[in-house]
């Protein structure tokens, strides 16, 4: 069988997800990521290599959020790097599908990447606001960062001998309100808040702080509610 050429049309047909449930990815990121995929499939780089690069770019973007006084537009560069890391998040899957190297290791690495980047940009977002005089921001950032580590989910799955819990934090009752914390939604809200504040106030402002309050308080309370709910479900 003749090997298909990695043309844009072939890549779009074979590399796109059959069902893309994330509108931002479907209508904005995927149309961009396919061009990066077109370049990368011509190199020896694997999907896992791209995922590692995604982690590095995401961490650099997160750190930029924490140093608003280092240089004026640091948080702006931060959100741009975070958006680029999400492009790479789409690219790694497209490369894996084209090169037929989809694996559990790749999926696992991708999920670990999300956890690392989300927790870091939440903490750095809070630290950056704290550096600009929002005294409670550091505590909120720590709370939001800590809640991104689903320690309770690991413990629950282990004692209940299941791999995937049906009462995931985003799928049960009022906990659905926390969907805005999911990746990439939380990153996009953060990006919009930072861009708005820099446009209106020339730096971190009240919009970013209000968003951090939502991340730090609502998500923390939701996580506590989920832990209690799971505790009483166990025999």
How should each PLM-predicted stretch be described?
Residues 56-59, 87, 112-119, 180-186, ...:
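Hydrophobic alpha-helical transmembrane bundles that constitute the permease/transmembrane domains
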């Amino acid at each position: 069988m003749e090997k298909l050429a990695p043309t844009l049309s072939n890549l779009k047909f074979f590399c796109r997800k059959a069902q893309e449930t994330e509108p931002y990815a479907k209508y904005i990121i995927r149309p961009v990521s396919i061009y990066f995929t077109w370049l990368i499939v011509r190199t020896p780089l694997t999907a896992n290599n791209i995922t590692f690069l995604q982690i590095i770019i995401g961490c650099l973007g997160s750190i930029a959020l924490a140093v608003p006084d280092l240089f004026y537009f640091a948080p702006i560069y931060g959100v741009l790097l975070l958006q680029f890391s999400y492009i790479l998040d789409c690219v790694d899957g497209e490369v894996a599908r084209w090169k037929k190297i989809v694996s559990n290791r790749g999926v696992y690495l991708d999920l670990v990447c999300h956890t690392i980047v989300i927790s870091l940009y939440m903490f750095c977002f809070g630290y950056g606001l704290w550096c600009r005089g929002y005294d409670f921001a550091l505590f909120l950032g720590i709370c939001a960062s800590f809640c991104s580590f689903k320690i309770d989910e690991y413990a629950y799955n282990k004692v209940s001998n299941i791999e995937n819990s049906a009462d995931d934090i985003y799928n049960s009752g009022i906990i659905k309100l926390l969907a805005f914390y999911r990746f990439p939604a939380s990153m996009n809200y953060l990006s919009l808040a930072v861009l708005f504040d820099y446009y209106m106030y020339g730096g971190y402002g009240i919009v970013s702080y209000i968003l951090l309050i939502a991340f730090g308080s609502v998500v923390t309370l939701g996580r506590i509610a989920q832990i209690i709910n799971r505790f009483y479900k166990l025999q």
